[in-house]
Curated annotation (Swiss-Prot):
Descriptive protein name: Glycerol-3-phosphate acyltransferase
Gene symbol of the encoding locus: plsY
Chain segments annotated as transmembrane: 3-23, 51-71, 78-98, 115-135, 140-160
Oligomer status and interactors: Probably interacts with PlsX.
Transmembrane among keywords: yes
InterPro entries from the UniProt entry: G3P_acylTferase_PlsY
Residues in the signal sequence: none
Main subcellular location: membrane
Subcellular location: Cell inner membrane
């Protein structure tokens, strides 16, 4: 019962879509209506409003971090923490408050990993930053980071074995790659947008709705 309650609370925390909330508060277009139509920081950046994108990134990462931190703070066992990690991640992917139309989970996963172990989170985030810096593809950076996160976990804590948190990290990585399946096709076809690109619809929306920021 304790695990179920913790997972439910985590799912509800994850269901808060900061991309939609921040955009609404700042008078910007709904990120689900332009660009990739993904409610995440990268798509919000396409509106031309960097402040909104940063707030979205921080908010999405924070909810992943706080869910796991609270589970640890209340002394829940590792199996409960593992379910909390997965639940907050699933909340972001399929938010009950937004008709189950969520983001791809990169920032939220990063927050979860930082709470699980700071070194694990930082190593994964650094991997994302390096790939994003050199290749300018947010999706490629996310995919590489997702692949390496379980590898970093093994280096830090050994093979998963009976460690439920390690299996949760692996599950999130698999889900994150699956959520990027459309991006994989675009990358292979050379049609993926680079970081900082503004599609016409997004640029128009940003000019009309986000020019005040």
């Amino acid at each position: 019962m304790q695990i179920l309650l913790a997972a439910l609370v985590a799912y509800l925390i994850g269901s808060v879509s900061f991309a939609v909330v921040v955009s609404s508060v700042m008078g910007l277009a709904d990120p689900r209506s332009y660009g990739s139509k993904n409610p995440g920081a990268t798509n919000v950046l396409r509106s031309g409003n960097k402040k909104a994108a940063i707030l979205t990134l921080v908010g999405d990462a924070f909810k992943g971090w706080i869910a796991v931190w609270l589970a640890r703070h209340f002394g829940l066992p590792d199996v409960a923490i593992a379910w909390v990690a997965i639940a907050v991640f699933l909340g972001h992917l399929y938010p009950v408050f937004f008709r189950f139309q969520g983001g791809k989970g990169v920032a939220t996963a990063a927050g979860v990993l930082l709470a699980v172990h700071p070194v694990l989170g930082l190593a994964t985030a650094l991997t994302w930053l390096i790939v994003a810096f050199f290749f300018r593809y947010s999706s490629l950076a996310a995919l590489v980071a997702a692949v390496f996160a379980p590898v970093f976990d093994v280096f830090l804590f050994g093979m998963p074995g009976h460690n439920p948190i390690a299996w949760a990290v692996l599950a999130m990585s698999v889900l994150l790659v699956w959520r990027h399946r459309g991006n994989i096709s675009k990358l292979l076809a050379g049609q993926e947008s680079r970081i900082g690109d503004k599609k016409k619809a997004a640029a128009d929306g940003g000019a009309q709705d986000g020019g005040k920021a």
